[in-house]
Amino acid sequence: MNKKKLGIRLLSLLALGGFVLANPVFADQNFARNEKEAKDSAITFIQKSAAIKAGARSAEDIKLDKVNLGGELSGSNMYVYNISTGGFVIVSGDKRSPEILGYSTSGSFDANGKENIASFMESYVEQIKENKKLDTTYAGTAEIKQPVVKSLLDSKGIHYNQGNPYNLLTPVIEKVKPGEQSFVGQHAATGCVATATAQIMKYHNYPNKGLKDYTYTLSSNNPYFNHPKNLFAAISTRQYNWNNILPTYSGRESNVQKMAISELMADVGISVDMDYGPSSGSAGSSRVQRALKENFGYNQSVHQINRSDFSKQDWEAQIDKELSQNQPVYYQGVGKVGGHAFVIDGADGRNFYHVNWGWGGVSDGFFRLDALNPSALGTGGGAGGFNGYQSAVVGIKP
């Protein structure tokens, strides 16, 4: 074969190889998990779960109801099934990602109007997309001994929300965007940051007395208030009566009990510079660790750690250490949908962590901290931007 023909053949092979590697549709044909396969995966998982089966009289009692996620959360990325007898299963839509992403043995899954849940799920979507660049199925990771820790907040019945009565002392919405007129005159949501932090404080029933006042000015970019808007919390004067700050609220509590939780929520929100809104609020985890120590007198062991500084194994070891010491973890990330903050308060021993989302128990369950294929992480590195700039506040104790 002469050099000219050999060169043409080599170029043809390289072009063909480039086409295969650069064409995600071709790759998806090999690795996509269709709806039937996803449902079968959910059924197989349920059959292996004694806790889920315990809620049914027989296997025939268990029915699956597909949750319509919509947008980027739908279709080829993941499937969510609510279980008729209680609980849910989240299945990846691609075989290059972990088959099961999350589950619960009770309740149901609902991300509608819950920005922190939608944002966390969106991080799964981005990670699954990253995995689609690979040409190998998910093989799992080396078995790492993980503690089994039952939900710490559940053990005390702690399930807070962002509306009434938790938000009775948050700022009142003064103006709105088009289509949001019903929010005018209503109290702002507590925000997932304040809700997560307050739940951890209730777990510890600490402090009995506030330490330091705090004031700040709302960002002039906030569209819901007239500016300047200054907020102040007289935290140093507070006596937090944890007998009146209940683990959860149904609306039938006394006014004293309602005001006790709303005061705590407002103090926490202000102490972290909450950017209040009618249905959500945002703040950074660096402010959480500062507020817990400086304003509420928590131990100086409280500090923030960032996912990007750790390998997957070392990051999960940090979380495991906290849970083994009966210390719930404040967890936060940022994605396209927005920020998300929640509490990690348990582990099942199989790399799933129990999440309390702060929506009164809705969608609480066990979730993977990421959906990345180990091959996408490289050697020894963190997860780059594919873990939604995750951070955690650890060492939270009186």
UniProtKB/Swiss-Prot annotation:
Outcome recorded upon mutating residue 17 to S: In strain: MGAS 1896
Region: C-terminal active site loop, residue numbers: 368-390
Listed result of changing residue 80 to I: In strain: MGAS 168
Molecular function per GO: cysteine-type endopeptidase activity; cysteine-type peptidase activity; toxin activity
EC id: 3.4.22.10
Documented effect of changing residue 382 to A: No effect on catalytic efficiency or substrate-binding. Decreased ability to mediate autocatalytic cleavage
Domain notes: The C-terminal active site loop is required for the recognition and recruitment of substrates and release of hydrolyzed products.
Similarity-based family: Belongs to the peptidase C10 family.
Stated name of the protein: Streptopain
Source organism (scientific name): Streptococcus pyogenes
